[in-house]
Amino acid sequence: MAEELPELALCCDGTVVEGRSNCRCKARAVLPGGMRVRLSKTLAGILRHHPGRYGVRLTREGWARVSEVVEGLRKAGWSWVEEWHIVGVALHDPKGRYELRNGEIRARYGHSIPVNVEPLPGEPPPILYHGTTEEALPLIMERGIMRGRRLKVHLTSSLEDAVSTGRRHGNLVAVLLVDVECLRRRGLKVERMSKTVYTVDWVPPECIAEVRRESLGRSL
């Protein structure tokens, strides 16, 4: 299922909100939901994987100038993009993918290029979820959850988000329930990177407490 998000509106007072009806004054401009999703995916690609394609420079902590991102997007054919679009996408991202500060932006997680993003404070819940497909299960149960092309394995505290992730990779969704205490006993540090996303270097097979088939709503 494709991600769906409401429109973003730039209000006359300079604020960016979801839905023009939420402006306290007249909306000056609107970013439709479909375009918002496309822009967010492109932004994630720039900040996580290939900033150089767009002429964007990242610091060691993953920060980029918003103005530089806008310039890179415009040169790549996104001629309509303005800074408020980038700020709005970041501020209202439902998964907390992005962080803003003083005219800069970065992705909080998901990188395949080496950056140093400090974790957020807060302890993980006892169980975290990882969405995948049934086709991938045999290898996962043998080797554990590997990081693949990313710097870290990504887990979530949201069952709904795990199901959504699994659906992006196939029709037969499997959700893995990961025992956080098991990870700790094996010296694996779990770090909180957004309001629902946590990262770890690896999940050993023995730390997978349960596997659920989402389509049937029961354990395998």
UniProtKB/Swiss-Prot annotation:
It comes from the Archaea. GO terms for biological process: tRNA splicing, via endonucleolytic cleavage and ligation. InterPro entries: Ptrans_KptA/Tpt1, RNA_2'-PTrans_C, RNA_2'-PTrans_KptA, RNA_2'-PTrans_N. The keyword Transferase applies. Its EC number is 2.7.1.-. Keywords: NAD, Transferase. One of its GO terms (molecular function) is NAD+ poly-ADP-ribosyltransferase activity. Coiled coil: none annotated. Transmembrane segments: none annotated. The keyword Transferase applies. Belongs to the KptA/TPT1 family. Removes the 2'-phosphate from RNA via an intermediate in which the phosphate is ADP-ribosylated by NAD followed by a presumed transesterification to release the RNA and generate ADP-ribose 1''-2''-cyclic phosphate (APPR>P). May function as an ADP-ribosylase. This is Probable RNA 2'-phosphotransferase. It comes from Aeropyrum pernix (strain ATCC 700893 / DSM 11879 / JCM 9820 / NBRC 100138 / K1). The gene is kptA.
